[in-house]
């Protein structure tokens, strides 16, 4: 079995169906003795250029280990699913299990937002001198 990295771009109007689609694809891989090494839902993101007048898409990343027949079946499902506007399949030499750079950046951004404190609204006058 070989290792593959799959990226799906799902139509933004179908974002609520992403979970069901992902579960169906995971089940297909696992039923054919494959393994899911990494699954990341990157959410809705701006496209670099419009695809069929669509400017945003919901991104999903998979790293799987499967055989050629299962991969061909997955690609066929991607091709005939109208909700998927683009798909990319890359063969990898090894299983990739670590978090992607995009996910790491998102985690760091969330951590920074959580640690930054909003200024107190009572202290908005910028005058720290007491005038008596």
Swiss-Prot record:
Annotated Gene Ontology cellular component terms: cytosolic small ribosomal subunit
Gene3D superfamilies linked to this entry: 3.30.70.60
Superkingdom as given in the UniProt entry: Bacteria
Record bears the keyword Phosphoprotein: no
Chain intervals with Acidic residues compositional bias: 122-132
InterPro entries found in the cross-reference section: Ribosomal_bS6, Ribosomal_bS6_CS, Ribosomal_bS6_sf, Ribosomal_S6_plastid/chlpt, Transl_elong_EF1B/ribsomal_bS6
Keyword list, A-Z: Ribonucleoprotein, Ribosomal protein, RNA-binding, rRNA-binding
Region described as Disordered: spans on this chain: 94-132
One term of GO molecular function: structural constituent of ribosome
GO process terms (BP): translation
Pfam families associated with the record: Ribosomal_S6 (PF01250)
Function in brief: Binds together with bS18 to 16S ribosomal RNA.
Family statement drawn from the similarity comment of this UniProt entry: Belongs to the bacterial ribosomal protein bS6 family.
PANTHER family: MITOCHONDRIAL 28S RIBOSOMAL PROTEIN S6, SMALL RIBOSOMAL SUBUNIT PROTEIN BS6M
HAMAP family linked to this entry: Ribosomal_bS6
Protein name per its UniProtKB record: Small ribosomal subunit protein bS6
Organism: Psychrobacter arcticus (strain DSM 17307 / VKM B-2377 / 273-4)
């Amino acid at each position: 079995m070989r290792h593959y990295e799959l990226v799906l771009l799902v139509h933004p109007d179908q974002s609520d169906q992403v979970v069901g689609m992902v579960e169906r694809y995971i089940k297909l891989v696992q039923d054919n003795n494959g393994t899911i090494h990494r699954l990341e839902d990157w959410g809705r993101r701006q496209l670099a250029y419009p695809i069929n007048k669509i400017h945003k898409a919901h991104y999903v990343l998979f790293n799987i280990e499967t055989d050629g027949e299962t991969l061909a079946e997955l690609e066929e499902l991607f091709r005939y699913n109208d909700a998927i506007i683009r798909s990319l399949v890359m063969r990898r030499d090894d299983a990739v299990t670590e978090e992607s750079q995009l996910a790491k950046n998102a985690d760091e951004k969330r951590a920074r937002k959580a640690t930054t404190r909003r200024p107190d609204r009572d202290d908005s006058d910028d005058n720290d001198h007491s005038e008596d």
